[in-house]
Amino acid sequence: MDMTSLWGRLAKLQSFFQDGLNVDENSHLPEADLRKISLGNLYVYQQQGVLNTFETGVTPSVRKVILGEYFGITDRDSAIETLNWLSQAPSQTMFHYAYTAFLQGGGNISRKWLNENEELKEHTDFRNDCLEKLETMEEKYPDIEQAGIVVSKEEMGKLGVLAWDAGRLNFISRLCLEQEYIVKEECMQCINAAYEMTKEVYTNWKDYAY
């Protein structure tokens, strides 16, 4: 099913759910554009925004809280700085260390590898974040494998967490545009960058969503 027909069906289904999916029946974005904006739609959905339009539909008050309190974005300069940071896929960097530790065998052996890593010794906050990610990885990997998302630890390493970084970059750049911190061209650069992050890694929406 192509994306255009998918959103059409979602619009019809919406009427059956009081708090269902929020789609605009009058929106007719090309499928290529829908693919790109959909990368940020988990976050749009969480804020009860519109899923099939370029505009997120997030209310101004909520938008201000997300940008200001969660991401420290209060003006153009902070918006550019944060979007540049998000475009570097920071979660993927953390995943690299946590995943490498995970491959050491798990448990205390993996934690020892992170704690003794020379590259992390002067970055204790980042190292602690990596330790948390390692714990989550050890807890969730059996479920990921059982669900058929990956068939091995090596395949999980290839998938990484680029979906998380790409989704945030997509969503936050659109909020910044709506808050008038950036212009449309800059927003599109972020959206395209997010799409490029994922298209070579995820071959289907199931892999991306997980």
Could you describe each region identified by the protein language model?
Residues 2-188, 193-210:
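Polar/charged low-complexity regulatory segments
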